[in-house]
From Swiss-Prot:
A molecular function GO annotation: sulfur compound transmembrane transporter activity
Domain of life (superkingdom): Bacteria
Main location: membrane
Gene knockout outcome: Mutant fails to grow on sulfoquinovose as a sole carbon source.
Family matches, as InterPro entries: MFS_2, MFS_trans_sf, Na/Gal_symport, Na/Gal_symport_CS
SUPFAM superfamilies, sorted: MFS general substrate transporter (SSF103473)
Organism: Escherichia coli (strain K12)
Gene it is expressed from: yihO
TM region(s), chain numbering: 17-37, 54-74, 88-108, 121-141, 160-180, 185-205, 238-258, 275-295, 303-323, 325-345, 379-399, 414-434
Role noted for this protein: Could be involved in sulfoquinovose import.
Protein name in the entry: Putative sulfoquinovose importer
A single BP term in Gene Ontology: sulfur compound transport
Keyword Transmembrane: yes
Subcellular compartments: Cell inner membrane
Length: 467
């Protein structure tokens, strides 16, 4: 730690692990909804599948704008206390996020319109609290380190944490829910346990991570939601990353939402979901561990594109030959191994675009950049929640009965073809239009530091003249 150059200064292992714990916690709360809420709506609340899709669409569009609000709040902060610029939002938003994550899985006996209204309101409230918590958590990376390799490692730890959270949700939620003879009670109790666990991990993150580089917003700069949009369109690398992420997150979430239906009705073994989750998430963890080394050897963009190729190949193989349990798990592992590199680097690339924006405009606005980026992610999540609900209705899905051949074929297309097509679009977008490579990034950081040193020298000279 004797090296004080921000570009080479290294973080200790404890802080990296603590940062990764944040995404364990947030994903324990988020992924129970991503994976099981649509099924809870259709099978427990008795909603038509398209009702669930509309709820996802409305609530996720709402939370896209709450992300922008979070960015506005972050960039508006002037007096930064000892807790830092971002950490207080993690501390205070984790409680309502955990509480509402549980309430979403409590069944009611109201009529369908009332059930739908309650479900929509709860989903929107969860989105608001989750935005305050998770956007602050993600936007914190530039304040933790300026070392690009350390940022890649933090992103890898974050993706590792997200993978562990997703793995636990995939492997443990249904077995926990099945312990109860009353399925509705099982959903509520399982959600409660996951929410408590998520809250604990968020607190471990809060206590273990420090903000080492807190840049206050310039006095003449006023944050606004409009500026979050402008931060995207005035920042070409960020815009390209947003478009690619729109595709990758939609593909990933569609796959997660449909896999519970696929294992139950196509493979006739819903318990296979736990085994598939165990092996495929294990492959993701291996991929995440390889991210720092592969990035160091080949660069972020090349590793990102290689991950996209693996993802697409795994889905194509599964569509044609994934009709039994063994091949489904095996080819899913290939696809999820590819997603490890893609999802890790989605986060590692965002801090680089923050620095690009500062270099281009002279204003450092982590909140606006990050929440502009997450706005696209929420739009993607809205579509990923809406499309399965609508498509389940279109293919003739009826809960808790044997499905027709047309419905089974529709499920296969939903879980494999749609994600594969979106992955290919994302790969083409990044391959042709993302130009912020490692060499250019180093030059940008060097120029930013030169500007700051020049400004400091000017201020010191002015102060000495005044005295």
């Amino acid at each position: 730690m004797s090296d004080h150059n921000p570009l080479t200064l290294k973080l200790n292992l404890r802080e990296k692990i603590a940062y990764g714990m944040g995404d364990v916690g947030s994903n324990l709360m988020l992924c129970i909804g991503t994976l099981y809420l649509l099924k809870f709506y259709t099978d427990e609340l008795g909603m038509p599948a398209y009702y669930g899709g509309i709820i996802f669409l409305v609530a996720k569009f709402f939370t896209a704008f709450t992300d922008m609000l979070t960015g506005f709040l972050l960039d508006s902060r002037k007096n930064i206390g000892p807790k830092g610029k971002f950490r207080p939002f993690i501390l205070y938003a984790a409680v309502p996020a955990a509480l509402i994550a549980t309430l979403q899985f409590i069944a009611t006996t109201f009529c369908l319109p009332v059930k739908t209204t309650i479900a929509t309101a709860l989903f929107m409230m969860f989105g608001l609290s989750y935005s305050l918590m998770n956007c602050s958590y993600g936007a914190m990376i530039p304040a933790i380190t300026k070392n690009p390799n350390e940022r890649a490692q933090l992103a890898a730890y974050r993706q590792g944490g997200a993978t562990i959270g997703l793995l636990i949700c995939t492997v443990a939620f249904i077995p926990l829910q099945s312990l109860f003879s009353d399925s509705t009670v099982g959903y509520a109790c399982a959600a409660l346990m996951f929410s408590i666990g998520g809250f604990i991990f968020m607190m471990l993150c809060y206590r273990g991570v420090k903000e080492h580089y807190v840049d206050t917003t310039p006095t003449g700069h006023k944050a606004s939601i409009l500026k979050s949009f402008c931060a995207i369109f005035r920042n070409p690398p960020l815009l390209v990353l947003c478009i690619a992420n729109l595709c990758t997150l939609a593909a990933f979430n569609i796959k997660l939402a449909i896999q519970v239906y696929y294992t139950q009705y196509v493979l006739n073994d819903i318990n296979l979901l736990s085994w598939m989750g165990f092996f495929s998430m294990g492959c993701i963890l291996i991929g995440v561990l390889l991210v720092p080394l592969t990035v160091k050897c080949f660069g972020k963009k090349q590793v990102y594109l290689a991950g996209m190729v693996l993802w697409a190949v795994g889905d194509i193989l599964n569509y044609f030959w994934g009709s039994n349990s063994f091949t489904f798990v095996m080819f899913s592992c290939v696809a999820f191994f590819g997603t490890a590199f893609v999802n890790s680097l989605n986060w590692a690339l965002v801090p680089d675009t923050v620095d690009y924006g500062e270099w281009k405009t002279g204003i450092r606005a982590e909140g606006s950049v990050y929440t502009g980026y997450t706005f696209f992610r929420k739009i993607s999540a809205a579509l990923a929640g809406f499309l399965p609900g609508i498509m389940l209705t279109q293919i003739g899905y009826v809960p808790n009965i044997a499905q027709s051949d047309a419905t089974l074929q529709g499920l296969r297309q939903l879980i494999f073809i749609w994600p594969c097509a979106l992955a290919i679009i994302a790969a083409l977008t990044m391959g042709f239009f993302y130009t912020l490579n490692e060499k250019r990034f180093a030059l940008i950081i060097e120029e930013i530091n030169q500007r700051k040193n020049k400004e400091m020298a000017t201020e010191e000279k002015t102060a000495s003249v005044t005295l």
